[in-house]
Amino acid sequence: MRSNATSCNASEPITVARRWYVLLILTFVYALSIADRFVMSTLIEPIKADLHLSDSAIGFLTGVALALFYVTAGLPLASLADRANRRTMIALALGAWSAMTAFCGIAQNFWQLLLARMGVGVGEAGGTPPSTSLVSDYFPWRRRALALSVYSVGASLGSMLGSSAGYASDAWGWRAAFLLLGVPGIVFAIVVALTVREPQRGRLDELPPPVRASLLDTLRFTGKQPALLHTLIGASVYTLWAWGLMWWTPSYLVRSHHMILGDAGGALSLMHGLGGTAVLLLTMLVMGKLAKHDARLVPWFVAAVIAIATVPSIIAYAAPSKTLTIDMLWIFIPLSYAPFGPTFALLQNLVPASMRAQAVALMLFFSNLANLVIAPQAVGFASDCLAARYGAESLRHALIPLAFVGFWAAWHYWQCAKHLAGGLHRAGNATLDVAA
């Protein structure tokens, strides 16, 4: 998986233009990944009606089907990404999950749609770990929080694209929405393969060339890193909370506040696209300043933002008023994007260069287990169980308890800060500033 034509020699300098070009390309790849993942939650209502499915079945399609292969393939693919050509892996993964997204549009029953969603999971498992590892070899450690915050803008842009599928569904049907998202990704995979170069690993870390690390080595190292453990757990609980709520928000707006799908998706697309991007860009600027002072300010910042965002998330799913719900979602959803960049940066700085892709894969393993397996299935099952008592309001009552989980995630990031100095030292990044 090595191509000399599109790989950087160890002595070849990486220009500023090349650095930012690769970052923007990878950001768009990430956006397509999130869009192809998020589109299912937007299209829950028409798919449920067309295929005559329960909330439990929809929860399975939304999360579990995607996660079955995402979480199982993620770790071995990340281990491969720490050894093989990352550019080639990203291009192949993008082409695979885009093709499977398009196939969702021609599925005729639950089982065909299930297989297609599993295929999306296999493809996406090979996307984020090599991408974040690649970014870390294009940007020096003092610029990684900034670069990975830019990369994280792909999450808000992808969620906006996925939410906008409601308009396509209203105009041409839910099948067309999948095709409109899947086909362009196949084309863009070729762009990645032809224009992105593979840099030398660890060339910007001012450290000796990294020794290849096995998955077992990474797991052993993680077990000795309290700061890394709290980051992994905090990220998992955060995704359980934020994305667990957001998977079901389009259906919640349709059922409890009687919005049509296009209007609900349109409102949410603005929250994700405009609000989320604004918060990510603001976070990028904040990270650039925090990294120059005390490294503990990064996890402290994440803990504070999550704790603050938890309050409007509770109100949004409990409020009887559509206006109040929309207002609270405008606070909760944009703020939920703030942890993306800082979390990726913490992971990259708390492990040696030889373990970066595997560290991200560990985070994705547990995070996706939480937000793709546990959250959608638990909420769907709870909604079905509560339907006899609450009717159309059963989904609201299933979501309210989940909204409180944000406080738990904030606590783990706060604990990460307490152990950060020792964690940076063990990872070989002791030069990062931690005030006494």
Please provide the spans of the model-predicted regions.
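Cytoplasmic helix-loop-helix junction between adjacent transmembrane helices
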Residues: 116-155
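Extracytoplasmic gate region of multi-pass secondary transporters
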Residues: 40-41, 226-280, 337-340, 344, ...
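Multi-pass alpha-helical transporter architecture, strongest
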Residues: 191-195, 312-319, 400-432
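Helix-breaking motifs and short loop linkers at transmembrane-helix boundaries and internal kinks
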Residues: 52, 85, 106-112, 140, ...
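Conserved MFS/SLC helix-loop-helix module at the cytosolic interface between two early adjacent transmembrane helices
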Residues: 72-111
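Extracellular/periplasmic helix-loop-helix junction of adjacent transmembrane segments
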Residues: 43-72
